[in-house]
Amino acid sequence: MINLKPVTDEKFSSVYKRLIDAFPYEERRDEADEKKCFLKSQFNFCEITDENESVGLIVFWVFNKFLFVEHIAINKEIRSKGYGSRTFELLKTQYNLPIILEAESPETEMQKKRIKFYENLGFKVNSYDYTQPSYHNAESVPLQILSFPQLLNEKEFDAFFRETREVVYEVLNAEC
């Protein structure tokens, strides 16, 4: 059975190393900045476990009207075994909120597979222009916004944009 286990101080570095392995530098925070996020009440950094065995990690933020998944990564050696799908199903039932996430435009085969994975879970690709703020004072990253269970209307997108800028990405400026 899939569980989301909050990462403790003792396990933080080892789980964070898996985040480094799964995401390019420009799509994640430095370790010190990631630790600052724990000061925000909306922040969740969890290990995904199955029968107490670690199968991946997820970083998400819970807001009043939506849940934002910032990162999810299943351990390389056990991908395509349904852990990602089951993790999203758990989020859907545990939080009963619309879920929003960012993904790269589908240009490579891997990116196309990733978008298809999310679409198979019921996520919709929104058409809003969106650029993820830089984690390292470099160039921002153009990404697509996906949402579950439906497309975001303009008001919902504006709320997502504003709240993630104020809370999620403000952490980058060390203002926790």
Question: Where are these predicted regions, by residue range?
Answer:
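Conserved active-site alpha-helix within GNAT-family acetyltransferase domains
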Residues: 105-128
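Conserved acetyl-CoA-binding loop-helix of GNAT-fold acetyltransferases
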Residues: 74, 80-94
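Conserved beta-strand in the GNAT
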Residues: 47, 53-61, 66-73
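Short amphipathic alpha-helix that is part of the acyltransferase structural core
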Residues: 1-29, 143-145, 155-176
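Active-site rim helix/loop that mediates acceptor-substrate recognition in acyltransferases
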Residues: 23-51
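A contiguous, mid-protein "functional segment" used to position or interact
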Residues: 124-157
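Short beta-strand micro-motifs in enzyme catalytic cores
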Residues: 44-46, 67-70, 140-146
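Conserved GNAT acetyl-CoA-binding A-motif
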Residues: 95-109
